[in-house]
Amino acid sequence: MAYRQWNEEASKAACATWYKRTDLLDTIRKIKKGDLSITAQVVAAKNLISSLTPVEWGHATRFPDTMVRTGPEHYVNANEGPYSDLLDTIYASTDKSTCDSSTNARGVTPTISMPNNSRSRDDPSLSRHQLRTALSQMEKALVNGESLYTRTTIENKLGIVWHAPAGGGGNQNG
């Protein structure tokens, strides 16, 4: 039973989209500086969010171990915790604020839970309010350290063991 649970958790972590905490926080703060009542600023926000690049790694490339001013870099799993719903809300809100597109960059259809009345369907300021709220919640979660992982924590969760053989570099996944 314990192995099955570990295997499910490791599979989810391996398939997840990981972002550097600092990249995500910098992007959120750049967006919050803009005037989101202006459509051009919402388009700029959408472009900033779409330009976020996930951490690239694989079986032969170790998860990056970056140092920041305060210590080791922390990473965010965009598929779990508070970040999954918040990122979806941010993507959907930017889509709803700029146009009624059918799908955004993450493949999320912009469905925003609002009261079913004509004002909510026609008023982009409501989705901009949701965008501001989601940005504030995301910034708060990142600053408070909610669901953040270091490289070591991620590798432990995946069960990866790295060995440096006596004759040179390399790795062994366990």
From Swiss-Prot:
Residues 98-126 are annotated as: Disordered. Disulfide bonds: none annotated. It is found in: Virion. Keywords: Capsid protein, Virion. Residues 98-118 have a biased composition (Polar residues). The keyword Membrane does not apply. GO terms for molecular function: structural molecule activity. GO terms for cellular component: viral capsid. Its main location: virion. This is Coat protein. It comes from Nicotiana velutina mosaic virus.
